[in-house]
């Protein structure tokens, strides 16, 4: 296996520099632990060092996936995050260890497994990764855009004038933002070219989302009462028609 080419290293360095610059800008705008966690989740797999004899195409796929999705995530969280939402209490720590850290472990872990995989990327693998990643990213962006800045946030918190969302994508599934990200997680899993790493990473992410959903739906029930119970009874959690 040949060393990673100079051109590939240059692309990796550009991706790293672009995301690092956006990360720093977001930190200047909203400096808090949530933004730091999101930023480092996608920055670490972008490091253009310690590549050795690696599979160039696979490393570049990992780099661009983390660059594109990382920008989406950190920009949305920076735009929607408010200082009053970040409260270091029991509920925050529950979400940190039960929801956030398992997903971070999945994303970083599968990214680094992919970076060390020596098997070349074939055309069908590339097509599957592209479809899963593009669909998942588009679904998440659309779902967040439809939710709006009041409803989408890192922590489980409710703001003044916030209403229950039951139309558009939320008419067909209760958590389209999480569904979108799970498709992206599946793209990361395929990129590893390892059944073990892919299944373990996907399990960690799925556990993290289910943990979040458990507490989020409890909070929604307390906030909106019967309206949420009726919505939950008729609307699937993850995918349309799978209630």
Residue ranges and their predicted role:
Residues 177, 226-227:
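Cytosolic histidine kinase catalytic core of two-component systems
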Residues 1-158, 188-219, 223, 229-243:
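Membrane-anchoring alpha-helices and their flanking helix-loop junctions
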Residues 154-178:
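Active-site-proximal inter-transmembrane loops
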Residues 105, 177-180:
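Extended hydrophobic secondary-structure segments
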């Amino acid at each position: 296996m040949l060393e990673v080419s100079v051109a590939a290293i240059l692309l990796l360095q550009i991706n790293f520099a672009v995301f690092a610059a956006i990360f720093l800008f977001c930190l200047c705008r909203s400096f808090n632990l949530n933004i730091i966690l999101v930023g480092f989740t996608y920055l670490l797999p972008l490091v253009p060092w310690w590549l050795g004899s690696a599979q160039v195409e696979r490393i570049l796929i990992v780099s661009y996936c983390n660059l594109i999705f990382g920008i989406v995530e950190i920009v949305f969280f920076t735009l929607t995050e408010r200082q009053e939402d970040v409260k270091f209490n029991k509920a925050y720590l529950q979400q940190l260890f039960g929801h956030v850290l398992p997903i971070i472990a999945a994303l970083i872990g599968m990214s680094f497994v992919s970076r060390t995989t020596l098997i070349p990327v074939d055309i069908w693998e590339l097509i599957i990764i592209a479809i899963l990643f593009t669909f998942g990213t588009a679904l998440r962006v659309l779902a967040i855009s439809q939710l709006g800045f009041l409803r989408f946030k890192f922590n489980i918190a409710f703001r003044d004038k916030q209403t229950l969302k039951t139309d558009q994508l939320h008419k067909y599934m209760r958590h389209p933002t999480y569904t979108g990200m799970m498709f992206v997680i599946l793209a990361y899993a395929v990129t590893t070219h390892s059944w073990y790493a892919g299944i373990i990473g996907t399990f960690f992410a799925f556990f993290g989302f289910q943990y979040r959903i458990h507490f989020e739906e409890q909070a929604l029930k307390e906030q909106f009462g019967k309206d949420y119970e009726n919505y939950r009874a008729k609307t699937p959690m993850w995918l349309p028609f799978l209630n």
